[in-house]
Amino acid sequence: MDSRSGKEQVAICDRAHHTLQFLDLKGNHKQTLTGYGLPANLDTLGKLMLVPELHARITLLNEKNEVVARLGDNVESVVKNKSVHRAKPHTWKNGKFVHPHDACFAPNGDIYVAEWVQTGRVTKLRKVS
């Protein structure tokens, strides 16, 4: 459930189409957001929505579904030129994601990210402002 705008709606990660889908509570389509790399999960805190993308980044959206930030963006290395691989830890760089499968907000706004990589990797992103 997504209530960031003040009105509840259903938010869906559509990995097959690389989109986020939004429906009203009766199941009627409201909005489709394109341009996501295998969105894996959603979490909200206040007016923000957190979208971990298996294609190497975390996206934050505001209550109007506008992109506020893209965190740890590593799409170029992981998806396009394939120089980073989830089974090869020596290719991973601090501050860059490889395969974020799940993420959630802590009550204070920190973000925890779990990546689906060979050894597993959990990252804490501390809220700074």
Give the predicted meaning of each segment.
Residues 1-129:
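Eukaryotic scaffold repeat domains enriched in small/polar residues
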